[in-house]
């Protein structure tokens, strides 16, 4: 279930901090703009718990371009994105119901709304985007505090 999957992400984060702490290092995040600020596709206090997030202002397409420019192994570049929290092979895109390319389009469409008519799939992707964005907004916003 989702609670168990999120626990795996939190244990992974704890392990990464233990390794970083033992080596005078930091934990570097891998989230991109769509995940971190669009649909909130990360575990609160799990893979979202990092010291620095160098890719967070980059769309997934930009991350792929960067990987290509850096000469990252093709096998890694072509691997289906997955959070690794499930033992059934499901990908990020299986879980979200849209591809990163589609969700990137949705973010850009919202930022720079065009007057072009939408296809049925584009309308569906916008609905997926807003559903995920709204459901996960608690992850993307600062922790609420009570003013005295």
What are these regions (language model features)?
Residues 1-10, 14-17, 21-26, 30-34, ...:
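ATP/NTP-dependent adenylation/nucleotidyl-transfer catalytic domains that generate, transfer
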């Amino acid at each position: 279930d989702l609670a168990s999957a999120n626990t795996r992400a939190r244990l992974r984060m704890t392990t990464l901090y233990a390794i970083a702490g033992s080596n005078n290092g930091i934990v570097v995040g891998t989230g991109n703009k769509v995940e971190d600020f669009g649909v909130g596709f990360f575990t609160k206090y799990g893979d979202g718990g990092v010291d620095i997030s160098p890719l967070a202002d980059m769309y997934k397409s930009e991350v792929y371009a960067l990987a290509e420019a850096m000469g990252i192994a093709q096998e890694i570049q072509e691997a289906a994105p997955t959070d690794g929290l499930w033992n059934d092979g499901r990908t990020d895109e299986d879980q979200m119901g849209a591809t990163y390319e589609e969700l990137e389009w949705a973010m850009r469409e919202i930022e720079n709304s065009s007057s072009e008519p939408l296809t049925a799939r584009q309308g569906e992707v916008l609905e997926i985007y807003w559903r995920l964005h709204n459901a996960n907004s608690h992850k993307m916003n600062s922790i609420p505090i009570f003013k005295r």
